[in-house]
């Protein structure tokens, strides 16, 4: 099956050569997502909860554009800049995954913009 590019309506163009998501063989791959506005500026500086909510809402739009839901998410890669934000990020994360949680990993690292606190990349398997 060929790959389909997934770009939700109203999405901003990434600054690098990638798209928000791709769909192939019923699997949605969502690119690393940060809390950016339409001009690729970081939103909610110093607010890990608001950034996490924005990131997960953006991811949800990509998955829904592909025909899935957040319940289809099977794996998340989470990158955070400071472990002090871990509990706040998990609080919001749990709102988006209230039932069975997807597998994931979380690492502390630097991100592409200094005000970014969290980045998440996602894989979802859409039921056929």
From Swiss-Prot:
It is an enzyme of class 3 (hydrolase). Its EC number is 3.5.-.-. GO terms for cellular component: cytosol. One of its GO terms (biological process) is uracil catabolic process. It comes from the Bacteria. InterPro entries: RidA_CS, RutC, RutC-like_sf, YjgF/YER057c/UK114. PROSITE patterns: UPF0076. It catalyses: (Z)-3-aminoacrylate + H2O + H(+) = 3-oxopropanoate + NH4(+). GO terms for molecular function: deaminase activity. It holds the Pfam family Ribonuc_L-PSP. Keywords: Hydrolase. SUPFAM superfamilies: YjgF-like (SSF55298). NCBIfam families: RutC (TIGR03610). Homotrimer. Belongs to the RutC family. HAMAP family: RutC. This is 3-aminoacrylate deaminase RutC. It comes from Escherichia coli O17:K52:H18 (strain UMN026 / ExPEC).
């Amino acid at each position: 099956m060929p790959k389909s590019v997934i770009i939700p309506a109203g999405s901003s163009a990434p600054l690098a050569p990638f798209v928000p998501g791709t769909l192939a063989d019923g699997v949605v791959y969502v690119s690393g997502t940060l809390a950016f506005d339409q001009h690729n500026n970081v939103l909610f500086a110093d607010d890990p909860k608001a950034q996490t909510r924005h990131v997960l809402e953006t991811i949800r739009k990509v998955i829904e554009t592909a025909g899935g839901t957040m319940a289809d998410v099977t794996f998340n890669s989470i990158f955070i800049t400071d472990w002090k934000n871990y509990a706040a990020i998990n609080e919001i994360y749990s709102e988006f995954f209230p039932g069975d949680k997807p597998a994931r990993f979380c690492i502390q690292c630097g991100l592409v913009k200094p005000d970014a606190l969290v980045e998440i990349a996602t894989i979802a398997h859409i039921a056929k």
